[in-house]
């Protein structure tokens, strides 16, 4: 896997999660990633409607890539992991949508959000890979994605959430992101040794 692709994948995940009206341009975000520094936008720039949009997007992103892996994975383990991701994130996304409806919160990504285009590029890139190369790229992406989501939850989203029910939901599902990260790292180690 090329270093350029890994930077691209990491950039698109961070942008998909953190570009929702937060300070900093795409170029600034890419530079932070290249230097290894996590993007840490100011928590006060977020409101609950934007956090709901970020939460929904993070789950949608992994539903899409999980479904792709369930179809294209070259090993049964990767296909099963992809199906698990799609199923888990679909359930959590629905919980978020149900809560947003209950609270009367409309997810509001800002104008100019490029996360859909970034995710489409990730899907195109992964779709062009086959066999063990697909498995490695998918798992590397999942490791980075879950690290980025966990960091965003801990340092950006939780400190900014105003509604206690929304906070409780994010806290409740955070361990699942940790579990997915551990599974992806474990699978990546096994796939890389083949």
Which residues make up each language-model segment?
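Hydrophobic helical h-region of N-terminal Sec-dependent signal peptides
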Residues: 10-15
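His/Met- and acidic-residue-enriched segments that coordinate or traffic transition-metal cofactors
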Residues: 2-8, 21-194
């Amino acid at each position: 896997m090329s270093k350029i692709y890994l930077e691209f994948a990491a950039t698109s995940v961070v942008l998909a999660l953190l570009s929702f009206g937060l300070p900093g341009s795409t170029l600034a975000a890419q530079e932070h990633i290249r230097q290894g520094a996590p993007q840490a936008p100011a928590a006060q720039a977020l409101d609950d409607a934007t956090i709901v949009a970020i939460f929904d997007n993070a789950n949608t992103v992994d539903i899409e890539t999980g479904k792709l892996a369930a179809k294209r994975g070259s090993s049964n383990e990767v296909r099963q992991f992809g199906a698990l991701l799609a199923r888990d994130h679909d359930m959590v996304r629905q919980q978020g949508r149900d809560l947003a409806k209950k609270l009367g919160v409309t997810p509001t990504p800002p104008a100019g959000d490029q996360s859909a285009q970034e995710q489409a590029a990730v899907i195109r890139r992964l779709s062009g890979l086959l066999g063990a190369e697909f498995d490695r790229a998918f798992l590397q992406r999942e490791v980075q994605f879950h690290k980025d989501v966990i960091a965003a939850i801990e340092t950006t989203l939780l400190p900014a959430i105003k509604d206690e029910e929304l906070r409780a939901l994010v806290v409740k599902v955070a361990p699942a992101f940790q579990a997915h990260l551990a599974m992806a790292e474990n699978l990546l180690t096994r796939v890389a040794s083949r």
